[in-house]
Amino acid sequence: MNIDYVKSILPHRYPFLLVDGVIEESEDRIVAFKNISISDPVFQGHFPEYPIYPGVLIVEGLAQTAGILLLKSVEGIPLFLGIDEARFKKEVRPGDRLIYEVRKLGEKLGTVQVEGVAKVDDKIVAKARLLLGVKKK
């Protein structure tokens, strides 16, 4: 599923829409991707001589992927409420295809906890547990 599908679900837009498409999804799991390009605005400052995609944007991409999963069953605006156990293992560089794998762990009091893993070439580059909610429209 392409960018049009993503834009039909998420409220985010360029330059802060960090998911390019969805590879697969089920009720409690989703796999999405972002193609990292040297033309991404972040590389004007992070770092021009040795561009590295920022870890915080990888985590935001995981959160947006989780938002797609949430908004399939609830209407509203996805809110990123918290992060635990974030780890960054490898650099992500222009030309990489970042794969986001997000799995729902549980729901409690209007919040959803997910586990996210980001990969490049089937190697883990980052992982985190995220807490999300949905603001009703």
UniProtKB/Swiss-Prot annotation:
Which reactions is this enzyme annotated as catalysing? Answer: a (3R)-hydroxyacyl-[ACP] = a (2E)-enoyl-[ACP] + H2O
Q: GO MF terms on file? A: (3R)-hydroxyacyl-[acyl-carrier-protein] dehydratase activity
UniProt GO BP: fatty acid biosynthetic process; lipid A biosynthetic process
On whether Aminoacyl-tRNA synthetase is a keyword of this UniProt record, the answer is: no
Task: Report the function annotation for this chain.
Answer: Involved in unsaturated fatty acids biosynthesis. Catalyzes the dehydration of short chain beta-hydroxyacyl-ACPs and long chain saturated and unsaturated beta-hydroxyacyl-ACPs.
What subcellular locations does the record give? Cytoplasm
Organism name: Thermotoga maritima (strain ATCC 43589 / DSM 3109 / JCM 10099 / NBRC 100826 / MSB8)
Q: Can you tell me where the transmembrane regions are?
A: none
> What class does this enzyme belong to in the EC scheme?
lyase
Q: What is this protein called?
A: 3-hydroxyacyl-[acyl-carrier-protein] dehydratase FabZ
Q: What is its EC number?
A: 4.2.1.59
Question: Short name of one Pfam family for this protein?
Answer: FabA
Gene encoding this polypeptide?
fabZ
Q: List the disulfide bonds.
A: none
Q: Does the keyword Zinc-finger apply?
A: no
Task: Name the catalytic site residues.
Answer: 46
UniProt keyword list: Cytoplasm, Lipid A biosynthesis, Lipid biosynthesis, Lipid metabolism, Lyase
Q: Give the main localization category.
A: cytoplasm
What's in the GO CC field? Answer: cytoplasm; membrane
Q: Which family does it belong to?
A: Belongs to the thioester dehydratase family. FabZ subfamily.
